[in-house]
A protein has these predicted regions:
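Adenosine-cofactor binding site in Rossmann-like domains, unifying the SAM/SAH pocket
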Residues: 1-7
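Conserved acidic-Pro-Pro-aromatic motif
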Residues: 10-94
Length: 94
């Protein structure tokens, strides 16, 4: 049996010690919702120039959660391209 340690995005960001992230690619099989909701609520998303996201639709309330994340993300980023529930790319504008 293998035991994995789960760390928060806040801890990882602090450990890396970098203020600016050029590109973040998110494809974590349904975990993207919790990750992005946390990053948006803590303003960590403002430190990322480009974010590429694969949203998965098998998560409960996937469409509503995706819409809410996209709305919040649009305050700091612009969607450059989107294939709904396949891949999308966002570029920071503020």
């Amino acid at each position: 049996m293998h035991i994995a340690t789960v760390r928060s995005i806040d801890d990882i960001h602090a450990e890396l010690g970098c203020d600016e992230i050029s590109l973040m690619k998110v494809n974590i099989e349904g975990g993207e919702y919790q990750l992005l909701e946390k990053m948006l609520s803590s303003d960590l998303v403002k430190n990322i120039e480009y974010i590429q996201i694969q949203f998965h639709d098998f998560v409960p309330d996937a469409k509503e959660r995706r819409d809410a994340i996209r709305h919040s993300l649009s305050k700091t980023h612009v969607c450059e391209w989107c294939y709904e529930f396949v891949w999308e790319s966002w570029r920071r504008v503020v």
